[in-house]
């Protein structure tokens, strides 16, 4: 619950089906619907990995439980026989580290307010004073946990997928669902909320029981799949714990684009520029995103930045994702081979069972992980690769880049493999086809831009990864000195 101008906005527990309507209705009642309140939506496309799922799929604002069927999805004589989905957790709280930085910035503004009484140069109440008085409701215990909005993300995704693929999510198949999750609570809670959404699909109108009481039982924790990066010694040594691996991130923080924002924000908030740094700017920007995503409200933190600032801050976030999870270092993506191979083992088994006229043992496999799970896998498959690497020095040249993490892995993002069996196939090869969906939209093949592939062709294209990429070898540290594989 958030207090704004004397009104209480009860948005944190409102059904997401009415998110937009409830928000604007509440704002109108509280006399807050001013032109400046549109800033939140104008900044929303630039929040990177803190982006709301509905900002990537705006149709969900009006119907979050109704599936949107991509016209490119196969139908007719081709029947889906298996679905393998990799799903990022839903909307979450900031981490404890982010909350501590926000508390530091908030304290800086409060100290500034006590010095000058919170008045601007004209004597009017200024933005710095408004931020000093804005309730700092984040607490350390929150530490990246799933919020109620995140549970809604998952329940509604379950309802949409069950409606889009009714044969796969049939009541008969419910007991054959396979759920795998990261050990992080936000992922475990996301998988539980997804199951509750399926219960709602099967038993409309009835409140779902605890997951432990469902016939299916709790999901299986498997960090070697969902958090493969934590189990890769080469990645941990050469990237995660390497002080120079994120050189371009640190260089951009002190570059002209970020320094211009730093000076502007210092002037706006009337604090010494030396008291601010790029990390504090980023936490202020993300606080705007958290308030919007978690509570559905636009806070004064959003007024600190304009769209040009947001684009620069988005690039800073994308630089980190690029060099730590994407194409920056080969090990980032190669460490995900084990997950990629696991997906194809499921598909292989389904093809084999169908060829033998046996029932598919696992028609639906749902795997709950992180943005850090999805980005390396998509990079391994060749998606969202720009001609030139993202660096600290080519921000303007990369304005139209493919690698934009907010469009790829927002909260509740999902990569789905759908295996089809086609009855009227002329050859055995044509019997099995595959489509991929990213965030519920058909994802063209990275190597051909076609929207569907014969399964055999897809497998052949990724033959090297499936046959030659051994995690134990990829993640083993070199015995002798070797050169960096920086792009």
From Swiss-Prot:
GO terms for molecular function: 3-phytase activity; 4-phytase activity; acid phosphatase activity; bisphosphoglycerate 3-phosphatase activity; inositol bisphosphate phosphatase activity; inositol pentakisphosphate phosphatase activity; inositol trisphosphate phosphatase activity; inositol-1,3,4,5,6-pentakisphosphate 3-phosphatase activity. CDD domains: HP_HAP_like (cd07061). It comes from the Eukaryota. Gene3D superfamilies: Phosphoglycerate mutase-like (3.40.50.1240). It is found in: Endoplasmic reticulum lumen; Secreted; Cell membrane. GO terms for biological process: intracellular monoatomic cation homeostasis. SUPFAM superfamilies: Phosphoglycerate mutase-like (SSF53254). Glycans are attached at residues 242, 481. Transmembrane segments: none annotated. A motif (Prevents secretion from ER) lies at residues 484-487. One of its GO terms (cellular component) is endoplasmic reticulum lumen. Disulfide bonds: none annotated. N-glycosylated. Residues 1-30 form the signal peptide. Its main location: endoplasmic reticulum. It catalyses: 1D-myo-inositol hexakisphosphate + H2O = 1D-myo-inositol 1,2,4,5,6-pentakisphosphate + phosphate; 1D-myo-inositol 1,2,4,5,6-pentakisphosphate + H2O = 1D-myo-inositol 1,2,5,6-tetrakisphosphate + phosphate; 1D-myo-inositol 1,2,5,6-tetrakisphosphate + H2O = 1D-myo-inositol 1,2,6-trisphosphate + phosphate; 1D-myo-inositol 1,2,6-trisphosphate + H2O = 1D-myo-inositol 1,2-bisphosphate + phosphate. Multiple inositol polyphosphate phosphatase that hydrolyzes 1D-myo-inositol 1,3,4,5,6-pentakisphosphate (InsP5[2OH]) and 1D-myo-inositol hexakisphosphate (InsP6) to a range of less phosphorylated inositol phosphates. This regulates the availability of these various small molecule second messengers and metal chelators which control many aspects of cell physiology. Has a weak in vitro activity towards 1D-myo-inositol 1,4,5-trisphosphate which is unlikely to be physiologically relevant. Belongs to the histidine acid phosphatase family. MINPP1 subfamily. This is Multiple inositol polyphosphate phosphatase 1. It comes from Pongo abelii (Sumatran orangutan).
